[in-house]
Amino acid sequence: KENAFFFYTVFKNEFKNFILVTDDLSPIEIESANIEIISPVLKKGKYKWMGYFSGEPIIFSMQSTEFKTIVQNGDIEFKNGSSINCFLKIKRQIDNEGVEKIIGYEVVRVNHYFENEKPIETKEGKKHRQTKEAQKNQINLLDDLGLAIKEK
């Protein structure tokens, strides 16, 4: 990577706008991320999972209590290539040089997991999908009503 330097003049009255209150950046949220599981956590506790995301190995915390319970009860058998589709939150910070760094990964919700390449929808995944579909249908209904009212 090449280092590029940009110069910008900051006037005294604007200076306060350039001071960072925190080095935390807003997290990147991915609604439908696929993670291949390398190392699941089969025991209760706040242990970290390992997986592959976008071709890179990652360590992540599993926030989905429903999925953790399914795993701890032995209802899911993990094999080479087992994966999940999930809502992934990527936490970021900015360092002293202004470089963005990833500081953690969190799986907030598991939409579905795969058994023999067949997706199995979780209860929380189904609930989220139905809520999203209902919101979409409401918007479409309101749009249709809006058009009907405008045409009269």
Regions found by a protein language model. Give the residues of each.
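Charged, alpha-helical interface segments at or near domain boundaries
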Residues: 1-31
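A short, charged
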Residues: 41, 81-99
